[in-house]
Amino acid sequence: GLIGAPIAAPIAAPLATSVVSTRTIHAAPVAVAHAAPLAVAHAAPVAVAHAAPLAVAHAAPVAVAHAAPLAVAHAAPAIAYGGYGSGLIGGAYGGGLIGSRSLYGGYGSGLGIARSTPGGYGSGLIGGAYGSGLIGGGLYGARYGLGAPALGHGLIGGAHLY
């Protein structure tokens, strides 16, 4: 009795305190860390990342790429040979080679510093904007990219990865 009680008290009370303290550290903070921050990280930022930036990337820049540059390409570039836009340097359509909008074929197929390489609209090799381009048209620094004609297939620096 005399020896048992004083020994039991110092052992029991600190253990009870330790258990309560552990529950405080592992229960409430974990709830805060897993509930509120996740709500912030998964709700508001995703809304911002998927709503406003996509609106900017898909609306305004595309409008700029389709409106102003096309206006420049339709007005200013020199025609080297053939019909409208089939130029060697600075051509806008058809068969442009360097610094032009197209290399051969239809609208927007270009080689160097151009909009696209072979085929239809926006398949670029260097500096292209859409389609199945290699550099600047899906591989490096492009908005759309490699292979499929669907929206947002880029590899490096594109709006979408694949």
From Swiss-Prot:
Sequence repeats (start-end): 27-30, 43-46, 59-62, 75-78
Keyword entries, A-Z: Cuticle, Repeat
Superkingdom classification of source: Eukaryota
Molecular function terms from GO: structural constituent of chitin-based larval cuticle
Domain free text: The tetrapeptide (A-A-P-[AV]) repeats found throughout the protein are also present in many proteins constituting the protective envelope of other species.
Function: Component of the larval cuticle.
Name this protein carries in UniProt: Larval cuticle protein F1
